[in-house]
From Swiss-Prot:
It comes from Homo sapiens (Human). One of its GO terms (biological process) is G protein-coupled receptor signaling pathway. GO terms for molecular function: G protein-coupled receptor activity; trace-amine receptor activity. SUPFAM superfamilies: Family A G protein-coupled receptor-like (SSF81321). This is Trace amine-associated receptor 2. Orphan olfactory receptor specific for trace amines. Trace amine compounds are enriched in animal body fluids and act on trace amine-associated receptors (TAARs) to elicit both intraspecific and interspecific innate behaviors. Ligand-binding causes a conformation change that triggers signaling via the G(s)-class of G-proteins which activate adenylate cyclase. The gene is TAAR2.
């Protein structure tokens, strides 16, 4: 989720703000890009790192999308949630991260103000949508592990459809509504002239909307995930203590629950590690008079993006079915007739 890279200019714009609708931008460079102070070596290194992250995000999530869509054995409620999350992360990597890479390295926005709003709306929507999907997966695993007898009646395809509708519609309405109304900038002195004269894609949140974004986009879903994981972890430990008294099929269920709890714990841990610094900075920045350094904002933004890079790597590491599906994709076997009925895993591996 990109944030503005023009905080250091805002204080200067405040001192020269006028009530006129048109601004004389001559002293601000007439929207021309400032000279890039980074050396060629630094820029090449930044492009290489960011391009690598984009490559993994796009093709890792694309492999997940193809795997779940193609192989019938993977058509389960849980995997439909993972499929939708992979689509979200794929779109973030394909449509947002390349523009963010150019802006971050060149310290300039080349694509105009109208596209800036469209870009930032999708950036904000996809980032929050990805987070909402992680929360939905946690809810799914909560019922599967803590209430296994009720799972098939509670987590049905219609329920998954409603969850997915919520995951996409709420972030979309929030992002496009806030960005195109420019409500996020109400009360920020100098913002109008910053938009009119700067060479960036300036989006910065005031105290109200910075707090709202932090609470709705991070704190609430994050708290839900941590609480759910705590309950799952407690139940899996309780099951593990009774492992010696169980039959083999029950023993396998306990092992599956333990693995699911471990995987979910890693997913939540990576989410908190990647997104907390970015959201916390957005929350604090308006209270600090927008004094956060540009380089720090860019670094935290890419740290958040990295969550979408990590998701397919986590599932690929912990789920054998994904590794087998990826192998078949790379070998081109999915183009064979009826190969979609291939058994990728035993039932105990499929969840």
């Amino acid at each position: 989720m990109a944030v503005s890279s023009e905080q250091h200019e805002l204080s200067h714009f405040k001192r020269t703000q006028t009530k006129k609708e048109k601004f004389n931008c001559s002293e601000y460079g007439n929207r021309s890009c400032p000279e890039n102070e980074r050396s060629l070596g630094v820029r090449v290194a930044m492009y290489s790192f960011m391009a690598g992250s984009i490559f993994i995000t796009i093709f890792g999530n694309l492999a997940m999308i193809i795997s779940i869509s193609y192989f019938k054995q993977l058509h389960t409620p849980t995997n439909f949630l993972i499929l939708s999350m992979a689509i979200t992360d794929f779109l973030l990597g394909f449509t947002i991260m390349p523009y963010s890479m150019i802006r971050s390295v060149e310290n300039c926005w080349y694509f105009g103000l109208t596209f800036c709003k469209i870009y930032y709306s999708f950036d904000l929507m996809l980032s929050i949508t990805s987070i909402f999907h992680l929360c939905s997966v946690a809810i799914d695993r909560f019922y599967a592990i803590c209430y296994p007898l009720l799972y098939s009646t509670k987590i049905t395809i219609p329920v998954i459809k409603r969850l997915l509708l919520l995951c996409w519609s709420v972030p979309g309405a929030f992002a496009f509504g806030v960005v195109f109304s420019e409500a996020y900038a109400d009360g920020i002195e100098g913002y109008d002239i910053l938009v009119a004269c700067s060479s960036s894609c300036p989006v910065m949140f005031n105290k109200l909307w910075g707090t709202t974004l932090f609470m709705a986009g991070f704190f609430t879903p994050g708290s839900m995930m941590v609480g759910i994981y705590g309950k799952i972890f407690a139940v899996s430990r309780k099951h593990a203590h009774a492992i010696n008294n169980l039959r083999e099929n029950q023993n396998n269920q306990v092992k599956k629950d333990k693995k699911a709890a471990k995987t979910l714990g890693i997913v939540i841990g990576v989410f908190l590690l990647c997104w907390f610094p970015c959201f916390f900075t957005i929350l604090l920045d308006p209270f600090l008079n927008f004094s956060t350094p540009v380089v720090l904002f860019d670094a935290l933004t890419w740290f958040g993006y990295f969550n979408s890079t990590c998701n397919p790597l986590i599932y690929g590491f912990f789920y054998p079915w994904f590794r087998r599906a990826l192998k078949y994709i790379l070998l081109g076997k999915i183009f064979s007739s009826c190969f979609h009925n291939t058994i990728l895993c035993m039932q105990k591996e499929s969840e």
